[in-house]
From Swiss-Prot:
Residues 514-516 are annotated as: G5. It is found in: Cytoplasm. Residues 67-76 have a biased composition (Polar residues). This is Translation initiation factor IF-2. It comes from Pseudoalteromonas atlantica (strain T6c / ATCC BAA-1087).
Length: 869
């Protein structure tokens, strides 16, 4: 494997960069976060972590118990015999366990002795080297002094000789002078060489003594290490290899006797030893396995594929710095690291191979023109459904609760310009997911904006959805029949969202329409046809169908019903349809008017019956040829979703511990939610979850499509939840449970009412809040002494009212010096309940006698404040 940076390695194993850098530093590897690490450095880190956490090797049994049973027959006479059975049980304790203390003491003593011997040897060598160096230095100094004396003597002698030679040279010839000079030079050179040789010998002797001392210390250290390694190796062999000799010596002659026909025979010691031989043979080399890894795998499944216990995998992950549980789901990268760490090989597999195979089996045909799919989007009450209603010549808006659309309505309309498929999306803020789903399934978006209302929050959201999906936008300015209509204002506000009309030099068509009078409807249909021609929409008209689930619900009489928009191919009755984790054979298809349809082509919305369950809205719908493959894919998707859900529910993470501890004081409002269609369940769940605050949390303990059943009521009773039904009702068995358990059951048909009432319920769960409100202030004018009550303050009420039963504060120079309660309140000699502004009174403060003239007595009351979300 190539070198990787510490940041990449930390991301792969799922730990922080700072922690990994610290672990490298502890292992004597100093690295920065952006530096690379080699395989040797990673192995060194793993060795260090392994030493820190301890080994995982298996131990041999510490004791062994042998049981022997011998049977003999005792003759009591000619015709009577008694069977005698002798049972013997012996326990053998492993020698290393019995002598563990003694061996440990001997080993400690031996180690100390060796260490002491090594220290003494090093000390002796150092002293010897020091003595040798001092002696040689002394000899060198003496030699130097002697040489200096000799040099001075020679110099004096040479001086005399030079003077004598000078006297002689004056009488010598030039040849004789040259010969004398040569002899003198040679003598000087010989003397210098002798001095250099003696100095070199002194240095070599000192160096040799130091080397001998160092080698002696190294030899002692090496022998001590070899002895330590030999001892450890011997202990390891004693732990893992069992000798037959001890078992043979432990068995005596009585243990190997058997009785056969009244005669006793002894087994040979060779046979006895063979019976006691250990049956397990140590593997000659490590077993290396090849593990097939998908996108996710649980710890228990990974251990099963490695043929080891799950605890071994958890230990390996702990050594890598990752905490895990036996049911935790690991991603592919983490699983690869664990497999490599444990010395095995891996093979990556594609979890979607079966789905890819289904797509490859799809029957396709040549492309042909298809009708456009148009989604009508906009703010609530801007007239989207009324506009579509006028086009369809039917009354749809009147059937929606509260006059607002709460489902995606899919309609196919025949116009003079050809067939058009319309999708009507809700405009309420809670239906964001449904609007986004409509934008991804559409070709053209019609943005309906009321001319008298302008751009609203959901209008902006619709523009964002269309831009994100890359779908062309046509703006329909509705309600032009009203006097307050102002289309120019709509253009101005939309231009701020980068939606500019063609009249202003942009690329978006603006059409003024009125859903009430029909004004501009034809122009709108022409704009749709023109935009569809520019897009040149095509799809295969025959072959295997493919589409998207627009909406789904559970019908009491017909079972799961899914609204499917066919995008390509032909969907026929009898086809096997796969929608997410649900599948089934299409039993019947119906259009938006409830009429049966035999074949549905591209851009045709139909209701499909016959699925195994209610599919999730927004899932792709695909016709497959083999029902068995469809079942396999659905089962695999379901298992994958379950693993993802399980991974989200992991609460054993250390980083979540403190968050869970802090959340202990948060109140929870549990809700069991049932709605008529899947889209409403999603929208209501998201809206209610967003209502959660730091003090009150909304918890959806159960949700689903269809009526309220006995199971839902039991779940609500067990979790102390309220049951909310949106356009659904409870059956008879559920009502019985609800009445018996006194569960709060509420029905709604408009999402506004549902959210408002849940808000009110959450407000009632808020902890009460109190505040102090000052109701009166009295100034101390004089202080009197009372034998019963102590100091009595003669006061004048300067603000508000002084009440007897309320708490007070004593202020001196506007600083609170005491807080307590009134013990006595009198007007003249009479006890009174309250004294108003401008009236004198006597006040006795309970357990406080240090009242002085000029102090102020402040009276307050504690008032509960109504909390709001």
């Amino acid at each position: 494997m190539a070198e990787v940076s510490i940041e990449k390695l930390a991301a792969d194993i799922g730990t922080s960069v700072d922690r990994l850098v610290k672990q490298f530093k502890d292992a004597d590897i100093v690295k920065a976060a952006n530096e690379n690490v080699t395989e040797d450095e990673k192995r060194q880190l793993l060795d260090y972590l392994s030493k820190q956490h301890g080994g995982t090797g298996s131990e041999a049994p510490k004791r062994m118990t042998l049981q022997r049973k011998t049977t003999s027959t005792l003759n009591m006479g000619k015709s009577k015999a008694v069977t005698v059975e002798v049972r013997k049980k012996r326990t053998y304790v492993k020698r290393t366990d019995v002598e563990e203390a003694r061996l440990a003491e001997e080993e400690t003593a031996r180690a100390l002795a060796e260490q002491q011997a090594q220290l003494e040897a090093e000390k002796a060598a150092a002293e010897e080297a020091k003595k040798a160096a001092e002696e040689k230095a002394k000899k060198a100094a003496e030699s130097k002094a002697k040489a200096e004396a000799e040099r001075l003597a020679r110099a004096e002698k040479a001086k005399k000789e030079a003077e004598a030679r000078q006297a002689e040279e004056s009488a010598l010839s030039p040849e004789e002078k040259a010969e004398q000079e040569r002899v003198r030079t040679e003598a000087e050179n010989i003397r210098k060489k002798q001095e250099q040789e003696s100095q070199r010998k002194l240095e070599e002797d000192a160096k040799k003594a130091a080397d001998e001392a160092r080698k002696l210390a190294e030899e002692n250290s090496r022998r001590w290490k070899e002895e330590e390694e030999r001892r450890k190796k011997q202990e390891a062999e004693e732990v893992h290899v069992h000798s037959n000799r001890y078992a043979q010596e432990a068995e005596d002659a009585d243990d190997i006797k058997i009785e056969r026909g009244g005669r006793r025979r002894k087994k040979s010691k060779r046979n006895a030893g063979s019976d006691l031989k250990h049956a397990f043979n140590k593997p000659a080399q490590p077993v290396e396995r090849i593990v097939r890894l998908g996108e996710t795998i649980t710890v228990s499944d990974l251990a099963s594929k490695l043929a080891i216990k799950a605890t071994e995998v958890i230990k390996a992950m702990m050594k890598m710095g990752e905490m895990a549980t036996i049911n935790q789901v690991l991603d592919q990268e983490t699983a690869v690291l664990v497999v490599e760490e444990m010395g095995h090989k891996y093979e990556l597999v594609n979890d979607n191979a079966l789905e890819d195979e289904l797509l490859a089996d799809k029957i396709s045909s040549e492309l042909a023109s298809r009708a456009p799919v148009v989604t009508i989007m906009g703010h609530v009450d801007h007239g989207k459904t009324s506009l579509l209603d006028y086009i369809r010549r039917a009354k749809v808006a009147a059937g929606e609760a509260g006059g607002i659309t709460q489902h995606i309505g899919a309609y196919s309309v025949e116009t003079d310009n050809g067939r058009i498929a319309f999708l009507d999306t809700p405009g309420h803020a809670a239906f964001t997911a449904m609007r986004a789903r409509g934008a991804t399934a559409t070709d053209i978006v019609i943005l309906v904006v009321a001319a008298d209302d302008g751009v609203m929050p959901q209008t902006k959201e619709a523009v964002q959805h269309s831009k994100a999906a890359g779908v062309p936008l046509i703006v329909a300015v509705n309600k032009m029949d009203k006097e307050s209509a102002d289309p120019d204002r709509v253009k101005t506000e939309l231009s701020q969202l980068e939606v500019i009309s063609e009249e202003w030099g942009g690329e978006h068509q603006f059409v003024n329409v009125s859903a009430k009078t029909g004004e501009g409807i034809d122009a709108l249909l022409e704009a749709i046809s023109l935009q569809a021609e520019l897009l040149d929409l095509k799809a295969p008209p025959t072959g295997s169908a493919k589409g998207i689930v627009i909406e789904s619900r559970l019908d009491k009489g017909r079972g799961p019903v899914a609204s499917v928009l066919v995008q390509e191919g032909q969907l026929k009755a009898g086809d096997i349809l796969l929608c997410g984790i649900e599948y089934g054979r299409v039993r019947a298809m119906r259009d938006e008017n409830g009429k049966d349809v035999a074949i549905a082509g591209p851009s045709t919305p139909v209701e499909v019956l016959g699925l195994s369950g209610v599919p999730v809205a927004g899932e792709d719908a695909l016709v497959v040829q083999d029902e068995r493959k469809a079942r396999e894919v659905a089962t695999k998707r379901n298992a994958k979703q379950r693993e993802i859900k399980l991974a989200k529910q992991q609460k054993a993470k250390l980083e979540n511990m403190f968050a869970n501890m802090e959340a202990g004081d948060v109140s929870e409002l549990n809700i069991v939610l049932k709605a008529d269609v899947q889209g409403s369940v999603e929208a209501i769940s998201d809206s209610l979850t967003k209502l959660s605050t730091s003090e009150v949390k909304v918890n959806i303990v159960g949700s689903g499509v269809g009526g309220i059943t006995e199971t839902d009521a039991s779940l609500a009773a067990a979790s102390s939840a309220i049951v909310v039904g949106f356009n659904v009702r409870a059956d008879a068995s559920a009502r019985r449970v609800i009445e018996a358990e006194e569960i709060d059951l509420r029905y709604y048909s408009v999402i506004y009412s549902l959210i408002d009432e849940v808000k009110m319920a959450m407000t009632g769960m808020l902890a009460p809040e109190f505040k102090q409100e000052i109701i009166g202030l009295a100034e101390v004018r004089d202080v009197f002494k009372s034998p019963k009550l102590g100091a009595i303050a003669g006061c004048m009420v300067v603000e508000g009212t002084i009440k007897r039963s309320n708490p007070i504060r004593v202020l001196r120079e506007n600083v609170v010096i005491y807080e307590g309660e009134l013990e006595s309140l009198r007007r003249f000699k009479d006890d009174v309940q309250e004294v108003r502004n401008g009236v004198e009174c006597g006040i006795g403060v309970k357990n406080y006698n240090d009242v002085k003239v000029g102090d102020q007595i402040e009276v307050f009351e504690i008032v509960q404040v109504e909390r709001e979300l």
